[in-house]
C-alpha cells in the first residue's frame, strides 16, 4: 500500500538538498511501483505543449512503444485534454484506449498540476480489473502535488 506521507517527505528532503525535478520524478515512480503488487506499470509523462503531446519521462515495468501520446488520445492524452484525473476500472470498455500491454485490465491517471498549469501525469496500469480505489487516487494525488511544487519552482 502506498504511504503517501512517507514519499512526500522523501521528495521534500530531495528538494531541500537541491535535487531537481528529474530526481523527484524518478523517485516517485520507483516508490509508487514498489508500493503495491497491483501496480504493474508506473510511469510519468510530461506535457510538451509545442508538440501537443505528453512524453514518457521514466517508468517501471514492461517497456512501452508509446513514448509520446497526442493530447486527447488514449486515457493519458484525454486526461490532460480534459484537465481531470481518470480511473478506468476496465480498459476494454474505453473506445480510444491505447494498448501498451494486452494484459492490462485497468488504469489510473493522476495529473501533476500547479495553479494554472498541467505539467504532466502519473500513469499506473494493473493486470487486475477494477484494481484502483479512491484511496489510491488520493494517495497518488498527494505525491503529484509535491512534484508540481518542484516543477512550478523550476519554471518560475
Regions found by a protein language model. Name each.
Residues 1-64, 151-156:
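Intrinsically disordered, low-complexity terminal regulatory regions
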Residues 36, 99-104:
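Short loop/turn motifs at secondary-structure junctions and domain boundaries
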Residues 41, 109, 121:
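Short hydrophobic/aromatic beta-strand element in the GNAT-like acyltransferase core
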Residues 47-100:
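Regulatory sensory and allosteric helical modules in signal-transduction proteins
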Residues 87, 111, 123:
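Conserved beta-strand segments that form the floor/walls of ligand-binding pockets within enzyme
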Residues 106-113:
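A short, aliphatic-rich beta-strand micro-motif
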Residues 118:
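Glycine-rich acetyl-CoA-binding "A-motif" of GNAT/NAT acetyltransferases
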Residues 126-156:
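Juxtadomain coupling helices with adjacent low-complexity linkers
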Amino acid at each position: 500500500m502506498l504511504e503517501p506521507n512517507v514519499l512526500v517527505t522523501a521528495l521534500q528532503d530531495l528538494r531541500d538538498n537541491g535535487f531537481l525535478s528529474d530526481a523527484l520524478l524518478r523517485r516517485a515512480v520507483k516508490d509508487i511501483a514498489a508500493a503495491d503488487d497491483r501496480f504493474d506499470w508506473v510511469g510519468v509523462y510530461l506535457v510538451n505543449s509545442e508538440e501537443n503531446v505528453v512524453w514518457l519521462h521514466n517508468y517501471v515495468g514492461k517497456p512501452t512503444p508509446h513514448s509520446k501520446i497526442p493530447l486527447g488520445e488514449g486515457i493519458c492524452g484525454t486526461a490532460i485534454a480534459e484537465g481531470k484525473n481518470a480511473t478506468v476500472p476496465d480498459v476494454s470498455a474505453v473506445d480510444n484506449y491505447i494498448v501498451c500491454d494486452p494484459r492490462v485490465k485497468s488504469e489510473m491517471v493522476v495529473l501533476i498540476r500547479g495553479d494554472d498549469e498541467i505539467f504532466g501525469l502519473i500513469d499506473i496500469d494493473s493486470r487486475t480489473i477494477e484494481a484502483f480505489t479512491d484511496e489510491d487516487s488520493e494517495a497518488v494525488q498527494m505525491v503529484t502535488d509535491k512534484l508540481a511544487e518542484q516543477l512550478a519552482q523550476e519554471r518560475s
